[in-house]
């Protein structure tokens, strides 16, 4: 069903404000009542309650009793209005008050009504109470003359904030009926919008007009405030323009000005949270938007809103990168071999292990990283490239302690190094040649580099009886080593297991030469095809790179090569004469293999050779 608006037809050069609709339940009841009592009026108007009020006012003009009650209530209203005006002038207002020029025949009246919970309240309310509730009285007018229940006279200047008048109705009656009364301006019985010209807003609200800002502060450093827009009547706009503006406002957010102020003067005011259904029928300028301001850790304010929020007003916090938290429980150390007697005590075993570890780590240590049991050697890779992240299972990550490689090279040249002149460096000399103690002058001329290599540089530990004050220019500093204590037990640290590269390498392919093929054929003719170890000892005893398996494989290759045509043969060529001998020996030993195994091989090789000649096999 389409609701027909009747505001445009009553327009006399200005637009009426939109009246908020009642809930659907109340509107449904009003519709049913109007259909039952008035069959002629079939159209539904949005301001039925305002029309009902007009009818009641017309009835009040004809009734003298109602006019008398009206005069009594008027006097009470005038007294209340004076007290309110005096209080408002003393307190002041944070929002500027615009000035309006109003003729002497104009007065300000409350004439916009809120809907009650049901229409039964209005039906049971007498005329005098109805006028008393809705405040159909003038506020502080001069030249008081009663005419049709209204006062005529010149209204005072600055009657309210933004053209609004303070409600002077009795609060007890309003509370009893549960009604709310929005304010508007009535001029001569007709509603008019206040003039928006020559308005002087406050400086703190330069970009927001004449608004009211209320707020409340909680104990948890959260600030809640809602910004109530003023009830200014806008100029008339066609439904098409309103529909376009509504669609545009839903697609794009509006920018919140940077100099937006948050006033906390009214601390005791509660924030108003509206639901969607309660805002039904309101225009965009009548809605109250609730803003929420909280403090972020970096002391910057973040503004959020229940109505509309500017995307530029939210400060994004910097995103922290993902960190990897490691919990190292143990380190792996290289394997150590320690020899101790069975009669040794546990304390001596501990000392021995401690000494072994000290010797291992005396030259410095370095940390190794193991991932899935494999050592990570590239130190320039990132943790994510290596596979170390907070999402992965860090149980596959390990660390090792390794001795740092020796950085001091062993000088094997015979050139004389520079003699240090600092006396402190002389005490750090670790060893000297045995010839230094023999008293032979110029002993360094006797030392040869070849002798040093052959003797593996047996160095004597540093002797404490050598005088530091009398340095000898003939001595040579070979390798600086720290002072070692000689122990009875030998400690041999094992750094790494040696890699056997020679076993891991693939064997080099060595093809048989013609001489080796001839020796193989001759040995097979004499010994047969089932004694390959004897063939190895007979013909290839000195050839370590030839095994009996190699000889057997080569014999099979020769038999296959001799049985095919010369065009199909591959590899190094073999003389045809040798291939013919291979075929004759293969045929002979294949026929007599069982008979020779039963009789046993003869110890004399010349007899076997003679048997081969008798069978027609040529050597």
UniProtKB/Swiss-Prot annotation:
Ubiquitin-like domain ranges (all copies): 324-403
Disordered: annotated segments: 593-619
Annotated GO MF terms: DNA binding, bending; telomeric DNA binding
Principal location: nucleus
Keyword Transcription regulation tagged: yes
Tissues of expression: Expressed ubiquitously. Highest expression in flowers and roots.
Family matches, as InterPro entries: Homeodomain-like_sf, Myb_dom, SANT/Myb, TRP_plant, Ubiquitin-like_domsf
Compartment(s): Nucleus
GO CC terms in record: nucleus
UniProt keywords, alphabetically: DNA-binding, Nucleus, Transcription, Transcription regulation
CDD domains the UniProt entry points to: SANT_TRF
DNA-binding interval(s): 532-559
Residues in HTH myb-type domain copies: 504-563
Subunit structure: Homodimer and heterodimer with TRP1.
Cited function: Binds specifically to the plant telomeric double-stranded DNA sequences. At least 2 repeats of telomeric sequences are required for binding. Induces DNA bending.
Protein name as annotated: Telomere repeat-binding protein 3
Recorded name of the encoding gene: TRP3
């Amino acid at each position: 069903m389409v609701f027909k608006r009747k505001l445009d037809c009553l327009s006399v050069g200005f637009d009426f404000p939109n009246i908020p609709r009642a809930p659907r339940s109340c509107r449904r009841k009003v519709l049913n009542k109007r259909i039952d009592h008035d069959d002629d009026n079939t159209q539904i108007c949005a301001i039925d309650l305002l029309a009902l009020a007009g009818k009641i006012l017309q009835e009040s003009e004809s009734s003298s009793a109602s006019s008398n009650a009206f005069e009594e209530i008027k006097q009470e209203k005038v007294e209340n209005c004076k007290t309110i005006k005096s209080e408002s002038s003393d307190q002041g207002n944070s929002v500027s008050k615009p000035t309006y020029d109003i003729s002497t025949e104009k007065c300000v009246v409350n004439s916009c009504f809120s809907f009650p919970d049901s229409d039964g309240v209005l039906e049971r309310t007498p005329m005098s109470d109805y006028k008393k509730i809705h405040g159909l009285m003038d506020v502080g007018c001069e030249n008081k003359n009663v005419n049709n229940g209204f006062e005529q006279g010149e209204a005072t200047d600055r009657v309210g904030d933004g053209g609004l008048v303070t409600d002077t109705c009795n609060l007890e009656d309003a509370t009893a009926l549960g009604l709310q009364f929005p304010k508007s301006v009535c001029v001569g019985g007709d509603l008019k919008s206040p003039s928006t010209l020559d308005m002087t807003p406050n400086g703190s609200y330069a970009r927001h007009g004449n608004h009211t800002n209320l707020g409340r502060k909680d104990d948890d450093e959260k600030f809640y405030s809602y910004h109530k827009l003023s009830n200014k009547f806008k100029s008339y706009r066609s439904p098409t323009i309103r529909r376009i503006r509504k669609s545009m406002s839903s697609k794009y957010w509006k920018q919140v000005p940077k100099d937006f102020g948050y006033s906390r003067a009214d601390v005791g005011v509660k924030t108003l949270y509206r639901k969607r259904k309660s805002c039904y029928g309101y225009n965009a300028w009548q809605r109250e938007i609730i803003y929420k301001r909280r403090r972020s850790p970096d002391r910057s304010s973040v503004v959020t809103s229940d109505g509309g929020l500017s995307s530029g007003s939210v400060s994004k916090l910097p995103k922290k990168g993902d960190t990897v938290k490691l919990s190292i429980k143990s380190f792996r150390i290289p394997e150590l071999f320690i020899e101790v007697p069975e009669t040794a005590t546990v304390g001596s075993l501990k000392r021995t292990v401690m000494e072994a570890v000290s010797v291992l780590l005396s030259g410095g240590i370095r940390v190794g990283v193991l991932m899935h049991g494999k050592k990570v050697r590239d130190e320039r890779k990132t943790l994510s490239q290596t596979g170390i992240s907070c999402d992965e299972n860090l149980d596959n990550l390990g660390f090792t302690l390794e001795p740092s490689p020796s950085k001091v090279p062993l000088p094997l040249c015979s050139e004389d190094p520079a003699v240090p002149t600092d006396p402190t460096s002389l005490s750090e000399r670790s060893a000297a040649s045995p010839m230094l103690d023999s008293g032979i002058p110029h002993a360094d001329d006797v030392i040869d580099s070849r002798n040093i290599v052959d003797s593996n540089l047996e160095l004597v530990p540093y002797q404490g009886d050598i005088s530091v004050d009398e340095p000898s220019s003939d001595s040579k500093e070979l390798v600086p080593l720290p002072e070692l204590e000689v122990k009875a037990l030998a400690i041999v640290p094992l750094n790494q297991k040696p890699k056997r590269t020679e076993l891991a390498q693939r064997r080099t392919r060595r093809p048989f030469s013609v001489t080796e093929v001839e020796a193989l054929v001759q040995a097979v003719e004499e010994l047969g095809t089932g004694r390959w170890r004897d063939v190895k000892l007979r013909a290839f005893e000195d050839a370590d790179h030839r095994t009996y398996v190699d000889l057997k494989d080569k014999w099979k290759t020769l038999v296959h090569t001799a049985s095919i045509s010369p065009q199909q043969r591959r590899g190094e060529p073999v003389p045809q004469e040798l291939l013919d001998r291979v075929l004759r020996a293969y045929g002979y030993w294949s026929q007599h293999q069982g008979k020779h195994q039963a009789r046993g091989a003869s110890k004399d090789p010349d007899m076997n050779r003679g048997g081969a000649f008798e069978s027609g096999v040529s050597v």
